[in-house]
Structure formats: C-alpha cells, structure tokens
C-alpha cells in the first residue's frame, strides 16, 4: 500500500507540472488568463484528478475561469495522453482553491485583533 500511495503522489505531481506547462503555453482561451495550480489529487484508480487552482481575477470572473478550464479539460487530457506514459489518463475536475483567500482573511483578522489590543493597552496606560 505505501508504494502505491507514493506512486499516486508522483503521478499527481507530474500531472500538475504538465498541466501548468500546457495551460501556460498551449491554451489560448482569454477567459483563463493567469492561474496558479496549487495541487492535484488523483484517485487510487487514476480515473479522476481534482486540479486545484487560484487566480488573480476577482470573484465575479472566477466563474468565467472555471468555465474556460472545464471547456479545455478534454484538450488538456488529450495532451496529457501524449506527454505521460500512463495506461489511464484521469478525467480532470477543476476546483477553485479558496485556502489562500481564507489565509489572507485570517491574517487580516489577527492584525486587527493585535491593533485593537495595542489601542486598549495604550488607553489603559494613560
């Protein structure tokens, strides 16, 4: 089992590298623009791959990016077939990764709490 698990991780990493290259160099869809692939999770049977991404677009444009990636999934899968030496090329499922936005929000909340504590200490000391 551990050997199979590490193979799954290696395949996921390879798919992420190849997809990043394909999206950067081969896709001409203006809806996609600049995106960053943050991770790929491949199922144990290699039939499905969840591709996590972030984008510099605002939230209203995320729908367009998602739609563009879903439309390009067949093309990307075909290109992966030519680049990877696998019997099964997984079906690609693109998922917007909100973890970076959540991290920024948490950081802002922490900064606000620290600033609030400082202002309370300053008013208490005077």
Swiss-Prot record:
One of its GO terms (molecular function) is ribosomal small subunit binding. GO terms for biological process: maturation of SSU-rRNA. Keywords: Cytoplasm, Ribosome biogenesis. InterPro entries: KH_dom-like_a/b, RbfA, RbfA_dom_sf, Ribosome-bd_factorA_CS. GO terms for cellular component: cytosol. It is found in: Cytoplasm. Monomer. Binds 30S ribosomal subunits, but not 50S ribosomal subunits or 70S ribosomes. Belongs to the RbfA family. One of several proteins that assist in the late maturation steps of the functional core of the 30S ribosomal subunit. Associates with free 30S ribosomal subunits (but not with 30S subunits that are part of 70S ribosomes or polysomes). Required for efficient processing of 16S rRNA. May interact with the 5'-terminal helix region of 16S rRNA. NCBIfam families: rbfA (TIGR00082). PANTHER family: RIBOSOME-BINDING FACTOR A, CHLOROPLASTIC-RELATED. This is Ribosome-binding factor A. It comes from Nitrosospira multiformis (strain ATCC 25196 / NCIMB 11849 / C 71).
